[in-house]
């Protein structure tokens, strides 16, 4: 019964579509611009770094908040907390409010790491940031960073926690399957982070 409740809580928090809500408040349906993905990277590319960052932070809080409540109120284990994060990832990728068409769970993964093993967050960005700045491939940086973090969970925590992190990593990788194909073909879209955080948003509000 506890498993069911934790899964439901994680899923419902994860289903909050900030990647849709934030652009919509500015008159933009993010599903109709750029890649059409309801995620922080697409928001960043089309609305600029500020709104992209806001979206990513809010997405990160989706697993972080229920994990913190569960840990400090009910004393759940780290593996149970990680399970909440995994189902938040499922909710983010397949939100009930948007006909199960959501994002790719990178920010949710970072939020889960923050809530279960915060010491690994700097490691994530230490891998992610150089890759993205050098290659300009957000997808490549995200997948490789989460791969490193998954290995570290197995090395520094229980195997149960590692399994849930592996499940979250596989979910995120699966959601990036199109990106992986484009990376192999040399067709993946590049994202200049510096430009994204300095350019003015050129999108006009939709009627």
UniProtKB/Swiss-Prot annotation:
GO molecular function, one term: acyl-phosphate glycerol-3-phosphate acyltransferase activity
Pathway linked to the protein: Lipid metabolism; phospholipid metabolism
Superkingdom of this protein's organism: Bacteria
GO BP of this protein: phospholipid biosynthetic process
EC number: 2.3.1.275
Keywords, sorted A to Z: Cell inner membrane, Cell membrane, Lipid biosynthesis, Lipid metabolism, Membrane, Phospholipid biosynthesis, Phospholipid metabolism, Transferase, Transmembrane, Transmembrane helix
UniProt keyword annotation of Aminoacyl-tRNA synthetase present: no
Membrane topology of this protein: Multi-pass membrane protein
Ranges that cross the membrane: 3-23, 50-70, 78-98, 120-140, 151-171
Location(s), subcellular: Cell inner membrane
Cross-referenced Pfam families: G3P_acyltransf
Matches recorded under InterPro entries: G3P_acylTferase_PlsY
Reactions that this protein is recorded to catalyse: an acyl phosphate + sn-glycerol 3-phosphate = a 1-acyl-sn-glycero-3-phosphate + phosphate
Key word Lipid biosynthesis present: yes
One GO cellular component term noted in the UniProt record for this chain: plasma membrane
Protein task: Catalyzes the transfer of an acyl group from acyl-phosphate (acyl-PO(4)) to glycerol-3-phosphate (G3P) to form lysophosphatidic acid (LPA). This enzyme utilizes acyl-phosphate as fatty acyl donor, but not acyl-CoA or acyl-ACP.
Family assignment from sequence similarity: Belongs to the PlsY family.
NCBIfam families in alphabetical order: glycerol-3-phosphate 1-O-acyltransferase PlsY
Quaternary structure (record): Probably interacts with PlsX.
Descriptive protein name: Glycerol-3-phosphate acyltransferase
